[in-house]
Regions:
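Hydrophobic transmembrane alpha-helices and immediately adjacent juxtamembrane helices
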Residues: 1-261
Length: 261
C-alpha cells in the first residue's frame, strides 16, 4: 500500500510540473469550470426570485446540496479522470498495451497517471457554497464526522461508475459515449430529487446512483432524515458498485485484445 501511495505522489508531482509549463491553460481551465458552476447557480437564484421554495426546499438548502455534490465530483475529476482516456482512445488505438508491460497494476496506473487540476474550480465553488450554507445545519460532532466520511464514499460512486463504463471498451474498443451518457446523470444530483418523477428518482437512486452522492446525505444533514438509509445507503451502494466495477474490469481485461492483433 505504501508503495502505491508513493507512486501516486510521484505521478501527481510529475503531472503538476507538466501543467505548470502551460500556466495560461491551467488558469483558463480552472476559471472555465468555476464560471460554469457560477452561471448555474445564478440561474437557480433567478428562479428563486420568483418562487419562495422548490418542492419545500429553500434556496439555501438547495445551494448546500449543490455544493455538496461538487466535492465528490471534483475529487473524482481531480484524481481519476484518466478513465475517460481508456474509454475514448487507449483501447481503440492500442495504447493500452503499455500498461500491461509495466510492473504496476494497470487500473491503478490509469487512475493515477493524470491529475486534472482544473477540477479545483469545482472544488472551490463547492467549498464556497458549503461554507456559506452550513449555518442552516445543527452541527454536532457525530454529524460532522459523518459528513467527513460521506465524501470518500460519494467520490467512490463517481469513480466506480467510470471504471464500469470505461471497461466496456475492452469489448467494444471504445466506450467514451457510454461514459458521457452515464455521467450526464450527475447533473440531477445537484438538486432535490423530489422535483423529478418517480421513474427518474428510482433511476438516479439505484441504477446510476448519483442521488447518493449529494441528495440523500444532504437530506440527513439538513432535515435529519433516516441516517440508516441516507448515510448507510450511501456506504452500501458505493461499495457494491465498486465491487461490481472491479469485477467488470477484471472480465474486460481477460477479454482484451490489442487493436493491432
Amino acid at each position: 500500500m505504501k508503495k502505491y501511495q508513493r507512486m501516486h505522489l510521484i505521478f501527481i508531482r510529475q503531472y503538476i510540473k507538466q501543467i505548470m509549463e502551460y500556466k495560461v491553460d491551467f488558469v483558463v481551465g480552472v476559471l472555465g469550470v468555476f464560471l460554469t458552476q457560477g452561471l448555474n447557480l445564478l440561474f437557480l437564484n433567478v428562479i428563486f426570485q420568483h418562487i419562495p421554495s422548490l418542492e419545500g426546499w429553500s434556496f439555501q438548502e438547495i445551494a448546500f446540496i449543490y455544493g455538496f455534490s461538487l466535492i465528490p465530483k471534483g475529487l473524482d475529476h481531480l484524481f481519476f479522470d484518466n478513465l475517460w482516456a481508456l474509454g475514448q482512445r487507449l483501447v481503440r488505438k492500442g495504447e493500452f498495451d503499455k500498461y500491461l508491460t509495466r510492473p504496476i497494476n494497470p487500473l491503478f496506473h490509469i487512475l493515477v497517471e493524470t491529475f486534472q487540476i482544473d477540477a479545483l474550480g469545482e472544488l472551490l465553488v463547492g467549498g464556497i457554497l458549503l461554507a456559506t450554507t452550513v449555518s442552516s445545519i445543527a452541527w454536532t460532532l457525530p454529524k460532522f464526522l459523518i459528513f467527513l466520511v460521506c465524501i470518500p464514499f460519494a467520490t467512490l460512486i463517481y469513480t466506480s461508475l467510470k471504471i464500469a463504463t470505461a471497461s466496456i471498451a475492452f469489448w467494444t474498443k471504445q466506450s467514451g459515449a457510454m461514459i458521457y451518457i452515464f455521467y450526464m446523470f450527475n447533473d440531477f444530483a445537484k438538486y432535490p430529487i423530489s422535483i423529478y418523477n418517480s421513474a427518474l428518482r428510482w433511476l438516479i437512486s439505484f441504477i446510476v446512483p448519483f442521488a447518493f452522492t449529494a441528495y440523500y446525505p444532504a437530506s440527513y444533514f439538513l432535515q435529519d432524515k433516516d441516517v440508516i438509509f441516507n448515510i448507510g445507503g450511501l456506504m452500501l451502494i458505493s461499495l457494491a458498485f465498486f465491487v461490481i466495477s472491479l469485477k467488470l474490469w477484471d472480465r474486460g481485461l481477460d477479454a482484451y485484445e490489442s487493436a493491432g492483433s
